[in-house]
Design a protein with these regions (language model features):
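Feature captures hydrophobic
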Residues: 1-141
């Protein structure tokens, strides 16, 4: 459904959760299926966690998933990765803000400016990952 047709928080939750789970899974598969640029991106990294979290009703990890990258290998997962701190954390402040950024109602940089999302950690690698997310989204449209 388009974002403006979502009637309640349950529908918003479902769309955001599915979107983030698909994004992290797609990023991992993009590496495993052999994209040369993504493989190089993963190969040159030690063990790193790219964490995605959506805050709702005061709960900072209401929705959470991650991409783990280590020496050319990648794995996606649900929840907060607890064995180490994230190398990059994409923190969305609300379901509505996450919907706007993930639904491309606003670009990621604009979402940061408007307070929908913040990135904590390496800005350079956050940009790299955002570029790969844009490539994957382009494949779907």
């Amino acid at each position: 459904k388009p974002n403006d047709k979502l009637k309640n928080d349950t529908e918003k939750l479902l769309k955001v959760k599915c979107s983030l789970y698909m994004i992290t899974r797609a990023l991992s598969q993009y590496n495993k299926l052999g994209d040369p640029d993504m493989q190089e991106f993963c190969r040159r990294q030690p063990d790193r966690i790219y964490q995605f979290q959506v805050e709702h009703d005061g709960q900072p990890d209401y929705i959470a998933c991650y991409l783990r990258v280590k020496a050319g290998q990648s794995k996606s997962g649900h929840g907060v990765y607890t064995r180490r701190s994230p190398f990059v954390l994409f923190h969305f402040f609300s379901l509505d803000g996450a919907l706007k950024v993930l639904g491309k109602e606003c670009e990621f940089v604009e979402g940061v400016e408007k307070g929908y999302v913040e990135t904590i950690g390496s800005p350079e690698y956050a940009c790299y990952l955002n570029d790969y997310m844009a490539i994957l989204q382009g494949m779907l449209t």
